[in-house]
Regions:
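Conserved hydrophobic beta-strand positions in leucine-rich repeat
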Residues: 6, 23-27, 44-48, 65-69, ...
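Single conserved hydrophobic/aromatic residue that forms the stacking wall/gate
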Residues: 1-12
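C-terminal capping segment of individual leucine-rich repeats
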Residues: 4, 18-19, 28, 39, ...
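Canonical leucine-rich repeat
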Residues: 13-14, 35, 56, 77, ...
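Serine/threonine-rich, low-complexity intrinsically disordered segments
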Residues: 3-4, 35, 71
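Leucine-rich solenoid repeat scaffolds
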Residues: 141-185
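Consensus "Asn ladder" position of solenoid repeat domains
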Residues: 30, 51, 72, 93, ...
Length: 185
């Protein structure tokens, strides 16, 4: 656990992080610009918020269940191979592209990014979504029957929110952007 061990710099370069049995890595608030976890295939928890990461390759980390990468400088993040992912936080980055694909994912916080779109169609267990302050014109939550928390305001660009008929409870608990129209599928 290197959480808040200020000044670690780039200690996590490939030659330094050879931990094939490591399942939890916390390295928040360390000003890291690179983090190579490719030699850690057993990681289930990765918390690396409040760093300076511009990229993060998770190709070899298919067991991750809890991923926290907020407050970095990430522009793209492919988490589509993380089929065991349950909670995911990537807020306050510079993301323009985000790929998710986990039947177990229940919690997504991706607010304050530059996302143009977000595909939620393969996230049937999604319970909470915070996606405000992005650049979507449309968002489709009609394939997310478990969704109970949906936060998309403010987002001036949002014009259409697609929902299913059974999601009326969301309208009671969420504040939609003024210009957005709700369309039932």
């Amino acid at each position: 656990d290197t959480d808040r061990s200020r000044g670690l710099g780039d200690v996590y370069k490939r030659q330094n992080l050879q931990c094939p049995d490591l399942d939890l890595l916390k390295c928040q608030s360390n000003n890291l610009t690179t983090l190579d976890v490719s030699a850690c295939p057993k990681l289930t928890v990765l918390y690396c918020d409040e760093n300076q990461l511009q990229e993060l390759d998770l190709t070899n980390n298919k067991k991750i269940e809890y991923l926290r990468v907020p407050d970095n400088k990430l522009q793209n993040l492919d988490a589509s191979n993380l089929s065991k992912l349950k909670e995911f936080y990537c807020n306050n980055n510079e993301l323009t592209d985000l790929m998710l694909n986990s039947l177990e994912l229940t919690w997504v916080e991706c607010q304050n990014n530059d996302l143009q779109s977000l595909d939620l169609s393969n996230l049937p267990a999604l319970y909470l979504l915070r996606c405000y302050e992005n650049q979507f014109e449309t968002i489709d939550v009609s394939n997310n029957p478990e969704l109970r928390g949906f936060f998309c305001n403010p987002m001036e660009s949002l014009k259409t929110i697609y929902m299913s008929e059974g999601q009326d409870q969301l309208l009671q608990a969420f504040e939609k952007p003024e210009a957005a129209e709700v369309v039932y599928k």
